From Swiss-Prot:
Organism from which the protein derives: Rotavirus A (strain RVA/Human/United States/M/1976/G3P[X])
Signal peptide location: 1-50
Start and end residues of each stretch annotated as GPR motif: 253-255
Entry's localization field: Virion; Host endoplasmic reticulum lumen
Name of the featured protein: Outer capsid glycoprotein VP7
Annotated InterPro entries: VP7, VP7_1, VP7_2
Keyword Signal among UniProt keywords: yes
SS bonds (residue pairs): C82-C135, C165-C249, C191-C244, C196-C207
Length: 326
């Protein structure tokens, strides 16, 4: 009996000794692996190009302000500025390096040369068909033309506001505008719009629904049309659909990353009289025009004051986003 107890105690002691040996061996192996791994990291760290993911950014303050990355020299937080101008400006200046000159001048106002983009357009009508405003801040220069006041006003209304639009099937349905913010916007190479208001029996008011020649014509061969009719009244429409598309749109509010600058003209365009414009102020301004160099110098000089009246938080705009924005 005593022999069995001694054997049991001896077996237990041997097991404890073996377990202790195994644990010490594992500890030495793990220490070797960890120290070797740390040694490799220490050796390779000077050779690695680390990236700081905003550790040194302040908690408060404007995120539009450029901060320098602690491990890189370039500016990684910056705003982009697009300047849209008519092609006649470049023709008059007639200098292949004029954009580089302006970029250097913008640099004196705190705008890096890589953040300024120059985009030309042929005329107001063609620009209105396919506006592309992709920068954080967009300045649109429109030279005043007394014969194009309506086109300039409609383009400004389109650019300075956000719109929610849906397609219209004018061959199958009647349409009505629900309130002042509800407009029909047409774009294309040639848009002719005719309307026929209907009474509660769907009979034409002053027109025949079966004869489009009796419809009232509200636009003729235009590239951009913002149609406003009597609210709450159904209308049958006739549109040159082969050269024009029409959408049922709702004005949502200001597009704050766009400013329209009228170049020259004794009359200043004003779209704030529209009751759907709220607040009754818009990012529209006028600069005197003698030569285009003078215009661009003025823009550079006042660019920061102009941008202060804007916000880069608005959505970008092109013709597709304008039609299908959700």
């Amino acid at each position: 009996m005593y022999g069995i107890e001694y054997t049991t105690v001896l077996t237990f002691l041997i097991s404890v000794i073996l377990l202790n040996y195994v644990l010490k061996s594992l500890t030495r192996i793990m220490d070797f692996i960890i120290y070797r791994f740390l040694l490799i990291i220490v050796i390779l760290s000077p050779l690695l190009d680390a990236q700081n993911y905003g550790i040194n950014l302040p908690i408060t303050g404007s995120m539009d302000t450029p901060y320098t990355n602690s491990t890189r020299e370039e500016v990684f937080l910056t705003s982009t500025l697009c300047l849209y101008y008519p092609t006649e400006a470049a023709t008059e200046i007639n200098d292949n390096s004029w954009k580089d000159t302006l970029s250097q001048l913008f640099l004196t106002k705190g705008w890096p040369t890589g953040s300024i983009y120059f985009k030309d357009y042929t005329d107001i009508a063609s620009f209105s068909v396919d506006p592309q405003l992709y920068c954080d801040y967009n300045l649109v220069l429109m030279k005043y033309d007394a014969t194009l006041q309506l086109d300039m006003s409609e383009l400004a209304d389109l650019l300075l506001n956000e719109w929610l639009c849906n397609p219209m099937d004018i061959t199958l349905y009647y349409y009505q505008q629900t309130d002042e913010a509800n407009k029909w916007i047409s774009m294309g190479s040639s848009c002719t719009i005719k309307v026929c208001p209907l009474n509660t029996q769907t009979l034409g008011i002053g027109c025949l629904t079966t004869d489009t020649n009796t419809f009232e014509e509200v636009a003729t061969a235009e590239k951009l049309v913002i149609t406003d009719v009597v609210d709450g009244v159904n209308h049958k429409l006739k549109v040159t659909t082969d050269t024009c598309t029409i959408r049922n749109c709702k004005k949502l509010g200001p597009r704050e990353n766009v400013a329209v600058i009228q170049v020259g003209g004794s009359d200043v365009l004003d779209i704030t009289a529209d009751p759907t414009t709220a607040p009754q102020t818009e990012r529209m301004m006028r600069v005197n025009w003698k030569k285009w160099w003078q215009v661009f110098y003025t823009i550079v000089d006042y660019v920061n004051q102009i941008v202060q009246a804007m916000s880069k938080r608005s959505r970008s705009l092109n013709s597709a986003a304008f039609y299908y924005r959700v």
